[in-house]
Amino acid sequence: MRIGHGYDVHRFAEGDFITLGGVRIAHHFGLLAHSDGDVLLHALSDALLGAAALGDIGKHFPDTDPQFKGADSRVLLRHVVALIHAKGWKIGNVDNTIVAQAPKMAPHIETMRALIAEDLQVELDQVNVKATTTEKLGFVGREEGIAVHSVALLQRP
């Protein structure tokens, strides 16, 4: 059994939506990133890669590589899943915490869980997504960006 932790942050930038957990959410900012900026799927990918001792997303999908410009993070996550399966691991469960002052996440969480479960090839009850604020403290509280913590448990079949 292996446990991995992932963490990612993206700052807000000009735009009118963000993508989190594969869900497009209307917002008065976008997220600054080389790919689609899905900070949730980036943190989750790092947690999975870390648990399998396969490095991090920067190693597999460098932001200096033009092929990943604007990349769909769901496609990247599916590639990560293929890598961990190739190493003989299966996913036990994943737990994700979105840290954001805005926008409100509650209306989108069940859709995020369903999309993530699909991409991970696991049951819905193996995927948790929750959200919290920082009570207006720090860069998140000032609405300068969004952070996500992810934990993944891998097991041998």
Swiss-Prot record:
Annotated site residues (Transition state stabilizer) in this chain: 34, 133
Keyword annotations of the record: Isoprene biosynthesis, Lyase, Metal-binding
One term of GO molecular function: metal ion binding
Obligatory cofactor(s): a divalent metal cation
Uppermost EC category: lyase
Catalytic activity: 4-CDP-2-C-methyl-D-erythritol 2-phosphate = 2-C-methyl-D-erythritol 2,4-cyclic diphosphate + CMP
Subunit structure: Homotrimer.
Function recorded in the entry: Involved in the biosynthesis of isopentenyl diphosphate (IPP) and dimethylallyl diphosphate (DMAPP), two major building blocks of isoprenoid compounds. Catalyzes the conversion of 4-diphosphocytidyl-2-C-methyl-D-erythritol 2-phosphate (CDP-ME2P) to 2-C-methyl-D-erythritol 2,4-cyclodiphosphate (ME-CPP) with a corresponding release of cytidine 5-monophosphate (CMP).
Recorded family membership: Belongs to the IspF family.
Protein name per UniProt: 2-C-methyl-D-erythritol 2,4-cyclodiphosphate synthase
Organism: Pseudomonas fluorescens (strain ATCC BAA-477 / NRRL B-23932 / Pf-5)
